From Swiss-Prot:
Statement: the UniProt record of this protein carries the keyword Metal-binding: no
Protein name: Propane 2-monooxygenase operon transcriptional activator MimR
GO MF entries: ATP binding; sequence-specific DNA binding
Provenance organism: Mycolicibacterium smegmatis (strain ATCC 700084 / mc(2)155)
Domain of life: Bacteria
Length: 583
């Protein structure tokens, strides 16, 4: 039985005593309330003012929203003659929906920002039915002065966590809020009942989705002779062809790429290079739609096993660092193409080292040769770029690298294609392109001249290569006078590296500016190494992130002091720390 202060006056006196002394007599309030007050105090929540951030627009297209919608409507109808609001939040306390029949009471809730898009997590709102339920993982009933923030003292709220039926992970909270003077234990019972109803609906929806996914998987398995892979929530289905063709490491990388496609609304096909040296083309064959969601997908997977090539040591091409089999396989394939004078497309993400790979291979095989690298940005006009390409490919045994052909302006594609047609069968051209290219003209006019495509893996897919890449780049930047300690290397290995090796070089350049010699610790890494977000920040966001990280370091990690030093509110710094993935 949850114990509360016997009267509103008791709770008010207890709160005032806690705020003035930081301590309370035993049993002055329920232990769950006291623990929450202590957390709120440590989080520097203002005890007298509501300082809630507008976090983001709620995502209404989620399983939680679809499962909760009819429950919220039914409860709102049942309570239509009462001043009670039904509130649904996400797992981070963001208010997703609010339903209330009493318009006057809705204005009261607006005044304290218990509204869509605002967060009622404890770190912002202190002790309350939503945030405390999320923090403890248990239902919470907070009445009147049991709220840490005095402005909320006129309310009572009963919150019950909503859990994913299979994993039991908290998805959000269902909360019933009324005026404190109208608080009734029945509110607590209703909130828990509503939470159970929503979980039941989630379970039913999961069953429907899983059944639909299984049906689609079986249908595609009958129709498609190659690999079939299905992903939906926590369910992964893989046919025998893939289980036999790919080992555990290959399957892990395949699932990583397929999961990215599942989340993407812009592309439905990708090519992945696997640790074994095989490559796979992954294509979305069928998206499963239950309700209005389509986060379950069945893929066709075609596996291309590389021809047997003896695995050489990592010193085979001295300029290249990396022990991962996927990267070494890429290097060996480019080398073979160069030795056989077969034109090759080297594709990969920006900054992954595509041009450098081609250049290093040529330098290794023919060290006496100087190979030109042509990039449109290095020329004043498109015409001068085309002229340089024509000149560099004029000899009988030419070799040239054209960087970022997917960025070439349309007006150079036809003349480039005409030149390549006259050069076919002699010399060697390597063209680099992005795996995310969106240029139909390049695909139509340029790529048909190339007989091979080699994919350079993203740095996050060969993170073990940091053990060679970091010392190599550091040695170059510091002339052999600096090295990373173990903690710094572990922090680098945690990062997603959306900018790949180019980003790594930038990070190490900034690091060497701070410490030019000796053993470099984690504290010398630049601010971006504290951010684990996979998206690439805009220049302005990167500046904000760096300023926040510096302030946190200068204030020993105290978020409130860091916010004050930056002249921003505590709510703002919490939101930006989360947005930027600052660890």
């Amino acid at each position: 039985m949850v114990r509360h202060a016997d009267t509103p006056t008791d709770a008010q006196r207890a709160r005032e005593q806690f705020l003035s002394t930081g301590a309370l007599q035993p049993d002055a309030v329920a232990s769950s309330v006291l623990n929450s007050w202590q957390r709120s105090r440590e989080l520097h929540v203002h005890p007298d003012r509501v300082e809630l951030p507008y976090v983001r627009d709620p995502d209404t297209d989620t399983p939680l929203m679809h499962a909760a919608a009819p429950v919220l409507r039914r409860m709102a109808e049942d309570l239509s003659d009462q001043s009670v609001s039904v509130v649904l939040t996400s797992a981070d306390g963001l208010v997703l929906d609010r339903v209330a029949a009493d318009t006057e009471f809705e204005r009261v809730l607006d005044d304290v920002r218990l509204a869509r898009g605002y967060s009622y997590a404890e770190e912002f709102a202190g002790t309350n039915g939503i945030g405390t339920a999320l923090e403890t993982g248990r239902p919470a009933f907070i009445r009147g002065s049991e709220h840490y923030v005095g402005t909320l003292g006129g309310l009572a709220c009963a919150g019950s966590p909503i859990r994913e039926p299979v994993t039991r992970r908290i998805l959000g909270v269902i909360d019933l809020t009324c005026r404190a003077r109208q608080a009734d234990p029945l509110l607590f019972v209703l909130a828990k009942s509503a939470g159970s109803q929503i979980e039941d609906r989630l379970r039913t929806m999961n069953n429907e989705t899983e059944t639909a996914l299984l049906d689609a998987y079986l249908k595609q398995s009958r129709r498609y002779p190659g690999g079939v892979l299905a992903i939906g929530g926590d369910v992964v289905l893989m046919n025998r062809y893939l289980r036999q063709a790919l080992d555990a490491a290959d399957q892990t990388v395949l699932l990583d790429h397929a999961a990215e496609l599942t989340r993407s609304s812009f592309t439905s096909t990708t090519v992945a290079h696997l640790p074994s040296g095989a490559s796979v083309k992954i294509s979305a064959a069928e998206r499963i739609i239950v309700g209005v969601r389509s986060d379950s997908v069945v893929f066709h997977v075609s596996v291309h096993v590389a021809e047997s090539i003896p695995v050489r040591s990592s010193q085979h091409i001295p300029r290249l660092a990396g022990q991962s089999s996927s990267f070494r396989r890429s290097a060996q394939q480019v080398e073979r193409c160069y030795r056989d004078r077969e034109w090759v497309v080297i594709e990969g993400e920006r900054g992954s080292g595509r041009t450098y790979l081609g250049y290093s291979v040529v330098h290794f095989v023919t060290p006496e040769r100087s190979i030109p690298v042509l990039h449109i940005d290095n020329f004043d006009t498109p015409e001068s770029f085309v002229a340089a390409f024509e000149s560099e490919t004029d000899s009988a045994d030419f070799a040239v690298i054209v960087s970022d052909v997917d960025e070439l302006p349309d007006e150079v594609l036809n003349p480039m294609a005409a030149i390549m047609q006259t050069r076919a069968g002699r010399g060697w051209i390597a063209a680099t392109t992005s795996t995310e290219r969106d240029s139909q003209l390049v695909d139509l006019l340029m790529l048909p001249f190339f007989t091979h495509t080699v994919t350079v893996p993203a740095l996050r897919h060969r993170i073990e290569d940091l053990q060679e890449l970091v010392p190599m780049i550091l040695n170059e930047l510091s002339r052999g006078e600096a090295r990373m300690d173990g903690e710094a290397m572990r922090q680098l290995a945690k990062l997603p590296w959306p900018g790949n090796i180019a980003q790594l070089r930038h990070v190490l350049t900034e690091t060497v500016r701070r410490q030019r010699s000796g053993v470099i610790g984690v504290d010398k890494l630049p601010a971006e190494c504290r951010s684990v977000t996979r998206r690439k920040l805009t220049p302005l966001e990167a500046m904000e992130r760096d300023a926040i990280v510096r302030s946190l370091l200068e204030n020993d990690g105290n978020k409130a002091d860091a916010a004050a030093a930056l002249g921003m509110s505590r709510a703002t710094i919490y939101r930006k720390i989360k947005d930027f993935g600052i660890a």
